[in-house]
């Protein structure tokens, strides 16, 4: 693909040049080619976007619930019509295989938008009788202008997960995509405008997180920040949001999730689940189950089943329908993952497979890392303690149920957890003791629109998806009505 035209900001229904004068490049990680130069939003651009959003939000919130619902449903239709085009752009920008982006990223994002479009008319207050002459009623009102700050691993899906409930509740959103993968968020802005969203209700500001993101979290005109990213960045976003104007926050942060295989499990099923929990999206999924706990007596057999399935991984041309494994999202990220692999070897973990870059003409110019499985791991190893966010699995052994629960919970993270067992009594007993916000039994990874998604401990605050997220983009106003004569004590 030839280099794209320079990408601008999207403010008030159209493209506009950044006043900052700064730019950055977005790279195709499969081959190292520059896709586009992208303009970076500065402080003045954030001010412009906030003013635009404030104007548009008043128009949007004044529309009836059904009018807003119809516009969002129209956007869903356009997303589905343009699925292949958007998936190709997402593949170029992220490096993910087209077989994945064409069936998951836009599809699931559109599902979430459709879900919230359907919930809009059900967003209602309540009536509370006090006595014969007085009652209270409540209204759920939009927050106003909110900010979404996205991660690089699911660019358009995250933009939809954040914008769908925000817009459904009557807010306007200013969205800052990751500077690593900014392209499809701009296309989403076009689609919202085409669907009839009033100008300013969805503005997109590409830029560097440490600058553009901080301008958003500092801005007094922003009522809430929804952030997806790492724990360290999340803490800064939360601190800035509180210090500036006590903004509400939703944080979807990192994870180091446990996947527990019990001794009664079908090992073929367990191996299939483990592969998806570690190597889907080349391991760049925040919920990945990278700490795989296996009974000691099952370890050897389980390892053989994993190795057999690693042979089925097909890396190569990311647009080949048979490819199911792409490069990492960037060269700096690849280098960071390789440092973790080297650390695992240094600390005594045994490499079962992988452990290096992929080599060959198809891989030499890209950010490719081989699917890597470590075994003979211990809980104190760096690769077991820290989030790697790449195709790196750690196999650990255990002897008892109590032991594995304790070790699974021995982490600052609490995003996800899963177990594989034929005993549903055991499944529920263990799941109820695991300290994680998203749990799976005999499956892994699905996050439907109806399912609240978020973490315990350092893995996040608040939830995305589900009914409660729509409510989190509103504020409750309580109104008391008195029909009898008011009595004053003065």
Curated annotation (Swiss-Prot):
K(+) 2 binds at residues 246, 457, 460. Its cofactor is K(+). Pathway: Amine and polyamine biosynthesis; betaine biosynthesis via choline pathway; betaine from betaine aldehyde: step 1/1. GO terms for biological process: glycine betaine biosynthetic process from choline. The modification Cysteine sulfenic acid (-SOH) is found at residue 286. It catalyses: betaine aldehyde + NAD(+) + H2O = glycine betaine + NADH + 2 H(+). InterPro entries: Ald_DH/histidinol_DH (IPR016161), Ald_DH_C (IPR016163), Ald_DH_CS_CYS (IPR016160), Ald_DH_CS_GLU (IPR029510), Ald_DH_N (IPR016162), Aldehyde_DH_dom (IPR015590), BADH (IPR011264). GO terms for molecular function: betaine-aldehyde dehydrogenase (NAD+) activity; metal ion binding. Gene3D superfamilies: Aldehyde Dehydrogenase, Chain A, domain 1, Aldehyde Dehydrogenase, Chain A, domain 2. NAD(+) binds at residues 150-152, 176-179, 230-233, 254, 286, 387. The record marks 248 as: Seems to be a necessary countercharge to the potassium cations. Involved in the biosynthesis of the osmoprotectant glycine betaine. Catalyzes the irreversible oxidation of betaine aldehyde to the corresponding acid. This is Betaine aldehyde dehydrogenase. The gene is betB.
């Amino acid at each position: 693909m030839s280099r794209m035209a320079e990408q601008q900001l999207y403010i008030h229904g159209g493209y506009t040049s950044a006043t900052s004068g700064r730019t950055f490049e977005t790279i195709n990680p499969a081959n190292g080619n520059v896709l586009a130069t992208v303009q970076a939003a500065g402080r003045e651009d954030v001010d412009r976007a906030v003013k635009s959003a404030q104007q548009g939000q008043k128009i949007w919130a004044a529309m009836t619930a059904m009018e807003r619902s119809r516009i969002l449903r129209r956007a869903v239709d356009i997303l589905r019509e343009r699925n292949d085009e958007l998936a190709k752009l997402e593949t170029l920008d992220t490096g993910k295989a087209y077989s994945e982006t064409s069936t998951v990223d836009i599809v699931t994002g559109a599902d979430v938008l459709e879900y919230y479009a359907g919930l809009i008319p059900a967003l209602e207050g309540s009536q509370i009788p006090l006595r014969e002459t007085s009652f209270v009623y409540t209204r759920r009102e939009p927050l106003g202008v909110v900010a979404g700050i996205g991660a690089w691993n699911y660019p358009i899906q995250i933009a939809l997960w954040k914008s769908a409930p925000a817009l459904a509740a009557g807010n306007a959103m200013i969205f800052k995509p990751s500077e690593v993968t900014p392209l499809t968020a701009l296309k989403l802005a076009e689609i919202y405008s085409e669907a009839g969203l009033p100008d300013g209700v969805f503005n997109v500001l590409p830029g560097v997180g440490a600058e553009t993101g901080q301008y958003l979290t500092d801005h007094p005109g922003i009522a809430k920040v929804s952030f997806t990213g790492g724990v360290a960045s999340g803490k800064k976003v939360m601190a800035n949001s509180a210090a500036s104007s006590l903004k509400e926050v939703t944080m979807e942060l990192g994870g180091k999730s446990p996947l527990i295989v019990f001794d009664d499990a079908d090992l073929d099923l367990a191996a299939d689940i483990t592969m998806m929990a570690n190597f889907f999206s080349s391991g760049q999924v925040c919920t990945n189950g990278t700490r795989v706990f296996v009974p000691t007596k099952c370890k050897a057999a389980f390892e053989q089943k994993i190795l057999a399935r690693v042979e089925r991984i097909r890396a190569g041309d990311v647009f080949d329908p048979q490819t199911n494994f792409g490069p990492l999202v960037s060269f700096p990220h690849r280098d960071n993952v390789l440092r973790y692999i080297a650390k695992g070897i240094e600390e005594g973990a045994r490499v079962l497979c992988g452990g290096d870059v992929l080599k060959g003409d198809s891989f030499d110019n890209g950010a490719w890392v081989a699917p890597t499985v470590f075994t003979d791991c211990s809980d104190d190893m760096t690769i077991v303690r820290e989030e790697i966010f790449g195709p790196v699995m750690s196999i650990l052994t255990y002897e008892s149920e109590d032991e594995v629960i304790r070790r699974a919970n021995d982490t600052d993270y609490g995003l996800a957890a899963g177990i594989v067992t034929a005993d549903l009594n055991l499944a529920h007993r263990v799941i109820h003791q695991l300290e994680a916000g998203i749990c799976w039994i005999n499956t892994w990874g699905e996050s439907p629109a109806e399912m609240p998604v978020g973490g315990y401990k350092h893995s996040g605050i608040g939830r995305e998806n589900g009914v409660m997220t729509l409510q989190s983009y509103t504020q409750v106003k309580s109104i008391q009505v008195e029909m009898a004569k008011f009595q004053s004590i003065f």
